[in-house]
Curated annotation (Swiss-Prot):
Protein name (record): Transposon Ty1-DR4 Gag-Pol polyprotein
Organismal lineage: Eukaryota, Fungi, Dikarya, Ascomycota, Saccharomycotina
Post-translational modification as stated in the protein's UniProt record: Initially, virus-like particles (VLPs) are composed of the structural unprocessed proteins Gag and Gag-Pol, and also contain the host initiator methionine tRNA (tRNA(i)-Met) which serves as a primer for minus-strand DNA synthesis, and a dimer of genomic Ty RNA. Processing of the polyproteins occurs within the particle and proceeds by an ordered pathway, called maturation. First, the protease (PR) is released by autocatalytic cleavage of the Gag-Pol polyprotein yielding capsid protein p45 and a Pol-p154 precursor protein.
Subunit relationships: The capsid protein forms a homotrimer, from which the VLPs are assembled. The protease is a homodimer, whose active site consists of two apposed aspartic acid residues.
Recorded catalytic activity of this chain's protein: DNA(n) + a 2'-deoxyribonucleoside 5'-triphosphate = DNA(n+1) + diphosphate; Endonucleolytic cleavage to 5'-phosphomonoester
Compositional bias ranges of the Low complexity kind: 153-165, 402-418, 960-969
């Protein structure tokens, strides 16, 4: 206090002032804004020591001119000394007026040196002209603290400025980082307040209390510049200073505004975290307070969910509300509203209880000595509000409280309470027993527990499932060492010594008994409310009594402390003494739980499971010995029989004992399979199978339907066949209960023939296993054969029949014999069998013309049932024939998609198997055939093979016509030539066009190398085919080449740019397509004949004869042929529907392509350049038996089987029908597949760009974690409908960039894998045009953005799998899809919901009602088109803020920021926009039309007179029927589709003057007459002439038609 008196009554110097501020009260008023108060204690001591040696001089009392401040007198300043003062600068202000300090004068007149202005400088002298700051922190003794309502402004500073008392000011610290500026401003404002400048600090509304003077402004500027270096200022502060470098007040105003906002949020969070409620205030007020805080935080972007809010509320509950912590913590989905419902209920109950309870006042002395807060607590309150809940609830384990005991309890035992007392009793402490009640029990208490809070009483516990006491005095019928597991609330085991009964004798003279456990290891004697409820006794805490359900009061309840108690005087004592409690004889009369009761209680579990669970203590409360298991074995629960009814267990081999007495073909199994959908009417949809029980011989018959007559015909046939062929009679036929077997017609037939029908029982398919397993085996074989051969689906039954023939010939591992051997038949002659789908050439014995070819390509199916011939499918004639006149095509093996068999052929094996049939062809027939071929210029097939040591010029030596050297006499070099499996061409999508994006009708691409072959019946095609002779390699090189990927085996030899070759024209007179055949003279034709007999010369011939030698050039080096780009080697062809990129002449084009159901990377029918060899035709004496399959021409065209063209037919097109069918046209494909963009792309530069785009897309997929890379799934384990096919597509964008995209085949996606109700929205064109118009009228900035791989940001909810990309090389695996891949049905909707949610929640946007994908707030409008965004705003900074938020979540690329005031060009959704803000906007498509129209292959007139109108007015279209070839019709429809599609796109974008003509012609797309085509060409010509026209908008001007 001495220091305080000194500062108030005696004048002191600056130095002594520093030393005098040592009072402890200074620290109690410490300002919270001062963060370095604790660091100045050493400075106090040092300054006190230094100033104690100085003399004190009285301060001047002169009053300055400024009425608000007092100026100090100038004093001499000693030289600066920094030695003894290493602390921060402590400057003491002499008076409150800063204008007198020369240090803070005009910026250009500041007399200081750098070391004097350092924050570490401390002026030791008392006459320093610089202000000194004391080491102590806080409000000075002579200055009142700021008001609590305004932290930053001292409202009394204006009055205190007049005082002459000295003030001790501490400077703010130096600003060292822009992030520390908010905290630094707080210290700077405190510095101003301590400098008596609190009145100039802006308040919350931005205005100071008083006007600032010039001197104060100078002081403000200089101090701010000193302590806040410009390089550490935030950007917004620099922006303010850039406008006015002295505008410190604006900086302070904005800082205070920011701090107020942050302070409010911080205060709300602190308030919410420190909530306290005990019912002292109304519950409504508490709820309003909490909900307002939560709403305010949510509005400020701080989201408080229900779980966090409830936890914060419950943590602050006390008193009677405290139990909600325990009852509500198990509710996972609890809401704030539900919690407040409970709080309101307790509050209302509390208010009612206070009105009904007598008021017992405590003695003041008791309140002073007892600091416990006695309030209602936890679990007993639950019973009071909901008694029924306790009656019906049981805990899995018995729990007991383990509450720490109190040592303040007296040793007196007095629990005698008046029986007539029914009023609630409230005991605040043990001294409140002054109502005539005694705390001593009248009975003998053998154990004195002095630690009980209320001795002689039982604690009522709603959480305990068992009653526990520590004394055995009240236990009746006790049994020792019970096997009971009891745990407390902390999961700790409580050892139990005995179990018995606890008997009560209540005040209504009724007796009740409950079970009780004895243990000395608990703090209180616990009375379980659950066990009381089991005997119809409940605790009413509103009346504080125990009562029955009829309202009879049994005993009062005493509340002491936080718990409720019942006196032990109602317990009946037992006759057992305490010392012998562990020796009590075990009572065998203890009643056990009946097993049916336990069975029902434990959810009807079986006895074995229940017994095992009790034995291992997984179920507590009772043990295995407590259950009566005597009836468990024989007990039959009727509910289990009904609810758990199952089928009987099928015993394996049980049927065999019933068939032991049957002979072969007496017991048959039969079953029907089908239907197979999407087949032509001529193909069967069902088949019926029969299996003999004894021999396991199998028969299959095709069915077109399941009618009674059809089934009866089959039964008649099979029975007659068995009777006549095997001399056996069928006795029993086993079948299922299908309607085709249970009908009356078949039943009568079987009854008439004495056959017993044996039906399976209901839903017992396993009893019909023989027939079921046969059907499954045959279908597996069918799918495999169709997949291997590539044949179309309508031949499925042929595959079934082929499999049946083979299966009957294979031995069974069980019987060691085949079915044919059991039936007494000979084994299958494999020399008569061909692989299913083997390509063959069939002789046409009845051609339409003598000059037409007589060989028809076909595919072998199976041996004939009715002849010695073979059933062969002829795609060109759309039928099957039974014939022996066929020739096997060597090298044309079945297509094996999944394996690389390119280096393998089965020609030698097939020759060896069929060698026995070679003798059927006489030599004179061969000679006669050769002579005929020479005379008619017919060319038989020859082998063109290469010499391994001559890669440059390989010449094929001609052989004389009489040479009949068989294929087996070939040299070793010929055997070394690798032969490639020639596979059936795959099905090609009919909607894919080859000329959809290029100007010419035929796409320019590298041609595929065809295998040269002609049939034995003659006919030569004049085809100009570039034949490439591949290199013959050594064995080592050949094996290495075979290990390469099959997808790239032709890539190097197909390129015209990399290979030199000679065109080898192969003439033919039987071809029908002569459009591209060059004119060749007869002499040249004779010279180029390749004779039939094959021969390989070991060395190049010395003399090259011009009439029998074909020169072939090959690449110069072996490495040049086999070299592949390293990057392409890692890019195998994906599983895509292959299509030949170019239609080129193929001499083996007669071999028809076969439709396949699955995709494959191999291009069907393409192999190495080895030619095919023929085998001598197999002749039989039997006539051909032709079975025609009637397939409609539409089906033929849909399958797109390009082979020998059938006779061209005319198609009649009706105008009205064509106009009505316009909507059914499918869109044109505008993208490239992998093989088109990379594999067969001969444009090297374009190919490299597509490869780069491919790798970029793969890296993006991995970056976005599109699929789960941790686990790969087997294709067989996944539901097929959840497997999505994928592919890579390539295209070139409008800006010239090449793009690759990995997409899913959504067109074949199963409907169960997506929600059809979800929609992907894009901005409507009119919405975009409206936004552009508003932007022009309001001088908006237009910013264009693009989000890369937008769909991949959206998660996918469904469980979907895709095949891995081709570069992973795992064709047999699947990966789990995690992101919305492009192409999926739901991807667009998922992305729209994702970006919509982000724009609304994070960017503060709202979707415009009526226009989806248009979002708006007060400053910015956004138009969303999938991954493109167009932003409109008045202020460009608003657009930038949105961009920054988007970049935080998405890979956002700015296409055009739009910040220039000059003309800016945009390309928005195909529109070329030129925009100058505030002046005009021009919309056009000149660049796009200049690029696209020439590619349409339309005859343009670029230099002629321009058209003045898009069409001739008043012209009517002729309605005569259009008669046109089908191929020509498709070509013209395809052309119309491209032309009208482009015109419609342009018209609806901005060329509205063309829409009438466009819509009229669009109705005639399917009626491509010459007149319609001419009108369409005229429209395109007009668009070409006016491509530079633009739609021009001027600001505040309406557009006129002249602008178009």
């Amino acid at each position: 206090m001495e220091s305080q008196q000194l500062s108030q009554h005696s004048p002191i110097s600056h130095g002594s002032a520093c030393a005098s501020v040592t009072s402890k009260e200074v620290h109690t008023n410490q300002d919270p804004l001062d963060v370095s108060a604790s660091k100045t204690e050493e400075c106090e001591k040092a300054s006190t020591k230094a100033n104690s040696q100085q003399t004190t001089t009285p301060a001047s009392s002169a009053v300055p001119e400024n009425p608000h401040h007092a100026s100090p007198q100038p004093a001499s300043v000693p030289p600066p000394q920094n030695g003894p003062y290493p602390q921060q600068c402590m400057m003491t202000q002499n008076q409150a007026n800063p204008s007198g300090w020369s240090f803070y004068g005009h910026p250009s007149m500041i007399p200081y040196t750098p070391y004097q202005m350092s924050p570490m400088y401390f002026p030791p002298g008392p006459q320093s002209q610089f202000p000194q700051y004391p080491s102590s922190v806080g409000t000075p003794l002579s200055t009142p603290s700021p008001e609590s309502g305004n932290t930053f402004t001292d409202s009394s500073s204006a009055d205190s400025d007049m005082t002459s008392t000295k003030k001790y000011v501490r400077p703010p610290p130096m600003l060292t980082s822009p992030n520390d500026f908010p905290n630094w401003v707080k210290t700077y404002i405190k510095f101003l307040q301590n400098s008596n400048l609190g009145g100039i600090i802006p308040t919350v509304n931005g205005k100071p209390v008083r006007q600032i003077t010039d001197d104060e402004l100078t002081f403000l500027y200089n101090t701010f510049q000193i302590f806040a270096p410009s390089q550490f200022l935030p950007t917004w502060v620099k922006d303010i200073l850039s406008v006015d470098y002295t505008d410190i007040m604006k900086i302070l105003s904005k800082s205070i505004e920011k701090m107020q906002s942050d302070t409010q949020e911080a205060n709300d969070i602190v308030t919410l975290a420190n909530l306290q409620y005990n019912g002292s205030t109304p519950a409504d007020a508490f709820e309003t307070k909490v909900t307002n805080i939560i709403d305010r935080l949510n509005n400020n972007g701080i989201h408080i969910n229900n779980k966090v809010a409830c936890q914060l509320i419950m943590r602050g509950l006390s008193g009677e509300y405290k139990f909600l912590r325990y009852t509500r913590h198990r509710h996972l989905n609890m809401t704030v509203a539900e919690l407040f419902l409970d709080i309101h209920a307790i509050y209302e109950e509390q208010q009612g209880s206070r009105n009904s309870k007598p008021n017992y006042r405590r003695n003041p002395s008791d309140e002073k000595n007892d600091s416990r807060s006695y309030t209602n607590t936890t679990k007993p309150k639950v019973i009071a509000r909901n008694p029924q809940k306790t009656n019906n609830s049981k805990s899995k384990t018995a729990r007991a409280h383990n509450v720490s005991t109190s040592n303040n309890s007296p040793s007196t035992d007095n629990d005698s309470i008046s029986k007539s007392t029914t009023e609630p009793i409230q005991l605040n402490n043990k001294h409140d027993l002054h109502l005539g009640q005694k705390l001593t029990e009248s009975t003998v208490n053998h154990t004195n527990h002095s630690d009980d809070e209320l001795p002689g009483h039982l604690l009522l516990d709603s959480g305990a499932s068992r009653t526990l006491i520590r004394s055995a005095h009240h236990i009746h019928s006790a049994s020792s060492n019970p096997d009971i597991n009891v745990v407390d609330a902390q999961k700790r085991n409580i050892p139990i010594n005995a179990i018995g009964d606890l008997q009560f004798h209540f005040q209504d003279n009724t007796k009740t008994s409950i079970k009780v456990l004895h243990t000395p290891n608990i703090a209180y004697d616990l009375l379980s409310l659950n066990e009381l409820a089991a005997v119809d006794i409940t605790a009413c805490f509103t009346k504080n009594v125990l009562e029955r359900s009829d309202g009879t009061v049994l005993a009062p309840i005493v509340k002491y402390g936080d718990f409720y108690w019942v006196s032990k005087k109602y317990l009946l004592p037992s006759n057992i003494s305490v010392p012998t409690i562990n020796n009590v004889h075990t009572s065998e009369s203890t009643r056990k739980y009946p097993y049916p009761f336990i069975h029902r209680m434990l959810a009807h579990a079986n006895a074995q499971t229940i017994r095992y669970s009790l034995k291992n203590n997984t179920i507590t409360y009772f043990n295995e010995s407590d259950v009566d298991w005597s009836s468990a074995i024989d007990y039959q629960c009727p509910d289990c029989l009904i609810g758990k009814s199952t089928k009987h267990r099928h015993i394996k081999g049980s049927r065999l004992k019933y068939q032991n007495s049957y002979e072969p073909f007496q017991y048959l199994h039969t079953d029907i399979f089908g239907p197979v959908h999407n087949l032509p009417n001529s193909a069967p949809s069902y088949f019926i199978s029969f299996t003999d029980e004894t021999t396991k011989f199998r028969w299959v018959y095709p069915l077109h339907d399941r009618r009674e007559d059809s089934i009866l015909d089959v039964f008649t046939t099979i029975l007659a066949f068995i009777k006549n062929q095997f001399q056996a009679s069928v006795l029993v036929i086993q079948m299922d209960r299908g309607s085709e077997y249970t009908n009356r017609t078949l039943h009568k037939f079987l009854e008439k023939n004495g056959i017993t029908p044996c039906y399976t029982t209901t839903a017992d398919s396993r009893a019909h296993g023989v027939a079921e397993r046969l059907n499954r085996t045959l279908l597996d074989d069918c799918r495999t054969q169709l997949q291997c051969s590539g044949l179309p689906n309508h031949l499925w039954f042929s595959a079934i029949e082929f499999s049946t023939i083979v299966r009957n010939s294979l031995a069974s591992p069980k019987s060691k014999k085949s079915a044919r051997q059991h039936a007494g038949l000979a084994g299958l002659d494999i020399s008569t069998l061909l692989p299913f789908g083997q390509p063959v050439i069939v002789n046409d014995h009845n051609p339409n013309s003598k000059i037409h070819p007589r060989g028809i390509p076909g595919y072998a199916l199976h041996p004939s049932r009715n002849s010695y011939g073979y059933i062969i499918y002829l795609p060109s004639l759309k039928k099957t024939v039974d014939t022996t006149n066929y020739v096997i095509l060597q090298g044309k093996e079945s297509r094996l998609d999944q394996f690389n068999y390119d280096a393998l052929t089965f020609d030698e094996d097939l020759n060896r198997l069929t060698a026995s049939y070679h003798s059927f062809i006489a030599s004179n027939e061969i000679q006669e055939s050769n002579d005929l071929n020479i005379e008619s210029d017919h060319d038989f097939q020859s082998d063109i093979e290469l010499h391994p040591e001559q890669p440059r010029n390989v010449l094929s030596k001609a052989v004389s016509p009489t040479d009949s050297t068989p294929p087996s006499t070939h040299t070793e070099d010929s055997k070394r030539v690798s032969k490639t499996n020639i596979r059936a061409p795959r099905e090609v999508d009919p909607n894919i066009s080859e000329s959809n994006i290029l100007p010419s009708k035929k796409r320019s691409s590298t041609p595929q190398i065809s295998n040269i072959e002609s049939t034995g019946s003659g006919g030569m095609h004049k085809l100009n085919v570039p034949l490439l002779a591949p290199m013959s390699q050594s064995n080592t090189h050949e094996s290495s080449h075979a290990s390469k990927s099959k997808d790239f085996r032709h890539s190097d030899s197909y390129s015209e740019n990399e290979t030199n070759h000679t065109n080898v024209p192969i003439s033919s007179t039987g071809g029908t397509n002569n459009k591209t055949v060059p004119q060749i003279s007869d002499q040249e034709t004779e010279k180029r004949i390749i004779h039939r007999s094959p021969s390989i010369d070991a060395s190049p011939p010395e003399n090259n004869s011009s009439h029998n030698i074909v020169p072939i050039k090959t690449p110069t080096t072996v490495s040049e042929q086999n070299t592949e780009e390293s990057i392409i080697a890692d890019l195998p062809l994906p599983d895509l529907p292959p299509e030949s990129p170019t239609e080129f002449p193929d001499p083996f084009k007669e071999l028809p392509p076969i439709n396949s159901r699955q995709t494959n990377s191999s291009l069907g029918g393409i192999g190495d350049s080895n030619a095919y060899t023929t085998i001598n035709s197999k002749k039989r004496s039997l006539e051909d038996n032709e079975t025609e399959i009637k397939v409609s021409r539409d089906t033929w065209n849909t399958k797109n089987m390009r082979s020998l063209e059938p006779p061209r037919s005319k198609k009649r097109i009706h105008l009205i029908a064509a106009v009505k069918a316009v909507k059914s046209i499918k869109p044109i494909r505008t993208t490239l597949r992998y093989d088109e963009a990379i594999t067969y792309n001969k444009d090297i530069k374009e190919k490299e760009k597509y490869i780069e785009a491919y790798h970029k897309e793969v890296n993006q997929l991995l970056k976005m974690k599109t699929w789960d890379t941790d686990e790969y799934y087997d294709r067989k384990e996944i539901d097929p409908k959840r497997v999505i096919n994928s592919m890579f597509i390539f295209n070139k964008k409008r800006d010239g960039t090449h793009k690759a995209r990995f997409v899913a085949r959504g067109d074949i996606q199963h409907p169960d894998t997506y929600d059809s109700g979800m929609q992907s929205n894009t901005v409507h064109h009119y919405a975009l045009m409206t936004s552009l118009s508003l932007a022009l009228d309001n001088n908006y900035y237009i910013t264009q953005l693009d989000i890369s791989s937008a769909y991949l940001y959206a998660d996918i909810k469904e469980e979907l799998y895709i095949r891995p990309p081709p570069h992973l090389g795992m064709n047999d695996k699947l990966i789990r899809l995690k992101k919305s891949l492009y192409g999926l049905k739901q991807s667009g909707a998922n992305w729209y919901e994702t970006i919509k949610s982000y724009l609304i929640q994070q960017c503060g946007m709202e979707e415009v009602r009526g226009w989806s994908c248009v979002f708006k707030n007060s400053q910015v409008t956004i138009c969303l088109f999938v991954d493109d965004m167009v932003l409109f705003s008045k202020n460009l900074n608003s657009n930038k803020r949105i961009i920054e938020k988007l970049k935080m979540q998405y890979d956002t690329k700015i296409i055009n920021l739009g910040e220039s005031d000059e003309e800016i060009q945009y390309d928005i959704l195909g529109l070329e926009i030129k925009y100058q803000r505030g002046k005009y906007m021009k919309l056009g498509m000149e660049n796009s039309l200049t690029e696209k129209i020439p590619k349409l292959n339309v005859p343009l007139n670029p230099k002629g007179r321009k058209l003045s109108a898009p069409g001739q007015p008043g012209l009517y279209i002729d309605q005569d029927e259009l008669e046109i070839d089908e191929d020509e019709y498709k070509e013209k429809v395809h052309e119309m589709q491209k032309l009208i599609g482009l015109a419609s796109y342009v018209g609806y974008k901005f060329r509205f003057d063309l829409l009438y003509y466009i819509n009229t012609l669009a109705q005639h797309i399917l009626f491509p007459s010459r007149q319609v085509l001419d009108m369409t060409y005229e429209l395109i010509q007009f668009m070409w002439d006016t491509r530079d026209k633009q739609l021009i908008w001027h600001k505040h001007k309406t557009s006129s038609d002249k602008n178009i």
